[in-house]
Each structure stands twice: as C-alpha cells, then as structure tokens.
Amino acid sequence: MSHGKVIAVDNPIIYKALTSSGPVVVDFFATWCGPCRAVAPKVGELSEKYSNVRFIQVDVDKVRSVAHEMNIRAMPTFVLYKDGQPLEKRVVGGNVRELEEMIKSISA
C-alpha cells in the first residue's frame, strides 16, 4: 500500500534502525482502514516533496509489538522522529495539512 518513496517495514529491528537517526515520518496503518488507504497517495507525494525525510509505513496488524510499544490506538497515526527521538505531538487521522506542517518542523 506504500506510494512514493515510502518504505514498508514489517520487522521491529528494521523499525528501530530506520528511526534511529535523521528526520523520519512513520505512518502506522492497517490494510482494512479506509482513511489509511485514502491518505496513502498524499503521503507518497509528501515523501517525494521532502526527500531529506525518511518515510516508513508500519502495518499495525503485522508489527503488533511496535504498535503496542508506540501506544497506537487509531489509524492512521503519524509519529515523527527527529535525531532518533519521537516527537511528543502526533497526527492522528488523515489531516495532510497538519502532517505537512510537522514535516516542515523536522526537515529544516
């Protein structure tokens, strides 16, 4: 279901490696989630626009341990990382405008 330069992650170890440095956007989604499917092409466009930011996608049903560890309660949920640390604020739902504003804050 990934679009653009979004990396699908299905392993907790790879997740840890990909979020350990730099600016990262993590899209927690589920294949059965309508809003997730609707927003995926827009996230793909953002991944092309912000090429200095790593975009990864985590299927909460396949990588339950990461979803649990990150306390994901709704999909889609976007968690942004800067220098290996998750930002406290998250984007829950398909608000692409809010997501892009947060991406700008980590990509500078």
From Swiss-Prot:
The active site is at residues 33, 36. Disulfide bonds join 33-36. Residues 1-108 form the Thioredoxin domain. Gene3D superfamilies: Glutaredoxin. The record marks 27 as: Deprotonates C-terminal active site Cys. The keyword Disulfide bond applies. It comes from the Eukaryota. The record marks 34-35 as: Contributes to redox potential value. Keywords: Allergen, Disulfide bond, Redox-active center. Participates in various redox reactions through the reversible oxidation of its active center dithiol to a disulfide and catalyzes dithiol-disulfide exchange reactions. PANTHER family: THIOREDOXIN-LIKE PROTEIN 1 (PTHR46115). Belongs to the thioredoxin family. This is Thioredoxin Asp f 28. The lineage of its organism: Eukaryota, Fungi, Dikarya, Ascomycota, Pezizomycotina.
